Amino acid sequence: MINQLLKPLVIASGVLFSLHCSQVLAVNVGDQAPAFKLPRLETQGDIQLKSYRGKVVYVDFWASWCGPCRLSLPVLNTLRKKYRKQGFEVIAINLDEEKEDAMDFLKEFPVAYPTARDVKGTTPEKYELRGMPTAYLIDRQGNINLIHEGFKKSDSQSLSTHIATLLKQ
């Protein structure tokens, strides 16, 4: 129990410390999105960002202990359904230490998009994640177009507009 309570604090401290130490290396809008290859959470196989080149991709980092993730995951389901045929995809990257925690969360908040798992934390390190949830909207050329930190219901309309604009390019 204590371990579960301390884990988010330790992760957040580490992320903030690494951010402080590497401000010059921060991933910014306009940068090429860092590549990743991660195991799928619910099925066999891997998810690689390069497989989605040519699509607009929303890479969303989440965890079962993240309150705003309870709002964002269902909204992302809706956005994916709305824009998928136009070339939009969502990739969710779970950062829970225990797979069961993520699976229990997805039973309560099911998603219809690919979900990967990164227990080692190498991908959030590459993206210099500062908090949860954080997402990166990536254009068809693989460049970061938007960094979306946190989530509230009122974000869904502006996010939808941003996705629609990118899909037209």
Where are these regions (language model features)?
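N-proximal helix/coil linker or "cap" segments that precede and/or mark the start of modular domains
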Residues: 15, 19-35
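A short beta-strand-turn-helix
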Residues: 36-57
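Bacterial N-terminal signal peptides that target proteins for export
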Residues: 1-10
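Thiol-/selenol-based redox modules, centered on thioredoxin-like
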Residues: 137-169
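Conserved redox-active cysteine motifs that mediate thiol-disulfide chemistry
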Residues: 61-78
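Short, internal strand/loop/helix patches
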Residues: 103-141
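Thiol-based oxidoreductase modules, predominantly thioredoxin-like and allied folds used
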Residues: 87-99, 111-120
